[in-house]
């Protein structure tokens, strides 16, 4: 989903690109169904990126550790990553003055960044 008009981010392009790549890679790696990504413009000059993907109900996620380096959730998964992707998302989002949050129950990750 995209807004009907252009959204200009007042940010470092390479950092935003890395954030989106890491979110998508993580979603693809752990998804058990269709992935939905959206971009919305909010009031207060903010862009909101949301990625939603269904995960295997057997996957255990500790919300308190989700953005920690090397945290991989369910270590028994054969396609588990290194555990740095979401930590990098958090680091870069913080550097850009934004915010990242997770709704574990519905498996939605949200990144909010400043726009022009």
Give the location of each predicted region.
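A residue-level detector for a conserved hydrophobic packing site
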Residues: 16-17
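Short helix-loop "hinge" at the ATP-lid/N-box region of the Bergerat-fold HATPase_c
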Residues: 27-28
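Conserved micro-motifs of the catalytic ATP-binding
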Residues: 4, 8-11
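Short conserved segment of the HATPase_c
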Residues: 58-71
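Short beta-strand/loop element within the Bergerat-fold HATPase_c
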Residues: 34-45
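Short alpha-helical Gxxx[C/S/T] motif in the catalytic ATP-binding
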Residues: 85, 89
């Amino acid at each position: 989903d995209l807004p009907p008009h252009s959204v200009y981010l007042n940010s470092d392009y390479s950092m935003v690109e890395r954030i989106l790549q890491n979110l998508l890679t993580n979603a693809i790696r752990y998804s058990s169904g269709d992935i939905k990504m959206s971009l919305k413009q909010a009031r207060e000059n903010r862009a909101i990126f949301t990625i939603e993907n269904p995960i295997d109900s057997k996957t255990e996620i500790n919300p308190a550790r989700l953005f920690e380096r090397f945290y991989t959730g369910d270590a028994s998964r054969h396609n588990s990553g290194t555990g740095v992707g979401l930590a990098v998302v958090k680091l870069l989002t913080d550097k850009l003055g934004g915010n990242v949050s997770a709704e574990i129950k519905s498996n939605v990750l949200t990144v909010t960044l400043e726009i022009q």
